[in-house]
Structures are given as structure tokens and as C-alpha cells.
Amino acid sequence: MKPHITVLMYHAIANAAGESPGADPHYAVSQAGFQANLKSISGAGKRCASVANLLNERADAATSIALTFDDGHASNLGAAECIAAIGGSADFFVNPSVVGTANYLDWPALRDMAASGMSIQSHGQHHRYLDEMSSSEVRQELVASKRAIEDHLGSPVTIFAPPGGRVSPDLAELAQDAGYQAVCSSRVGLWCFGEALWDIPRLALLMSTPQAQFSRWVSQAPVEIFSRRARYALLSSAKRLLGNQGYERLRRGLLRGASS
């Protein structure tokens, strides 16, 4: 029987002052929270692995928790160092158009991360929603980002993560044609290893994700996973109904209300 893998999705790690310049604070996990996450994984007898290593059979699927990071925020360098220190790996999805700009990783940092065993993959050339683009534009995002990362780092780019989790109907076909082997989406659930390579589900860490809930993700508690999938289905319906701009306005309003 194929193992089911918990694939985690991070964005930024807040600094010691609890700040994450240039990142959406809603998705910025505290340093203490991230360290607690790593301890929870180790305590469960699991190891941190990149999706790339799992696909290349350099990690044991049955004993791994996959870690992924979207956007290439500068704080990801510290996260990579923590992961490398415990012998783990992770995938970091970056947009070449912002590499080296304020609050983002630069190419030397990405080279150091790759040398330490991290997997540097594509988040598109720009952080644009694919469902608002033509097929030719999506193809350009896939091809240009892959080429830029490979040219700068000298390592293969085989996995894509669509910005904002928005996908185009033909993404799988376009990604395969561009030389990718898998897509890590924002769909919520567990990954049945070896299946759904063009729609690998992930669980997103938020600033507000409690450690107890994280531990249930690691243990793959059925009720917890079901509730997250139900919430995702509801939010996906809202996105379809409101459109990207309407959904983002609603989301910002809800977040302001929650913090007031």
C-alpha cells in the first residue's frame, strides 16, 4: 500500500521581533513556532524531506514529512539552515523576477541553500495568478523561471508551485511540456505517494496555526484532515464565486476584523 505523506507549505518565518518585512503576516510563522514544528516532526519519528528527494527516492516516503516554502522570502535562509542542521531537506519555490530585491533571497543565498541539500524550484517567473493568464503566458512563466533558476544554480528545476494556488486548466500539460515532473498545489489533503503528481496537496502553515493542530497534521488525524479539506472546499467556492479580486478584498477585511 502506498504511504500517505503530509506535505507542509510555509511562506515566511518572522524575525525575533515578530516581524516579517515584505511578507503577508498572516502566513508568517514565528521562529519559536517553526522550531516547535521541527521538534514535533522529530518527536513523531519522522524526517524532513523535500518533495524532490521523495520523487528521486533519496528519502523514505513512509517516514518523511515534506516541507515546502513559497515566495522566496529572505527569512527562508534561516529556515533552511535549521532544516539542514537536523539532516533534512525542503523545497523552496521562488520567483526569479524578485530574487535579490528587498526582503527576498538573492542568488548567492539560494546557491548556499542548494549546496546544503535544499531543493530550489519554480514559483513562476513573476508572482501572477495563472487563472488570469493565457496558455502562452502560463507557458512563458514556466519556461522562463525554470531556465533562470537552472542557469543561476546549475541544478534541475522539476517542480512547480502556482502562485496563490491559482491554476490554469491546462497547467499539467504545459508543465509537462516544459520539463517539469510535478506540481505542488494549494489543494488541501494528504499526498498518496506517487499519485496526483500534477496536483500534490499541501497543508498551509499560518501565523495562527496552533502547535496541537500541527501535531495532528503530522500524525494525519482523520478528523483533522477532513475538517481542513472541508474548509478548503468552502474557500475554493468563494474564490470561484467572487473572483480573485473580490476574494482578496473579502480576505483582507476578515483579517482586519480578526486583528482589531
Q: How would you label these PLM feature ranges?
A:
Residues 1, 17, 201-260:
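Membrane-proximal basic amphipathic "stem/tether" segments
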Residues 3-17, 23-25, 62-65, 73, ...:
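Metal-dependent polysaccharide deacetylase catalytic core of the NodB/CE4 family, i.e.
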Residues 16-18, 168-170, 184, 191-195, ...:
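Short active-site-adjacent structural elements
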Residues 26-60, 85, 150, 176-195, ...:
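C-terminal domain-boundary segment and adjacent tail
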Residues 33, 76-77:
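Short, acidic/polar
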Residues 94-99, 187-191, 205-206:
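Short, acidic/turn-prone active-site loops that include or flank metal/cofactor-
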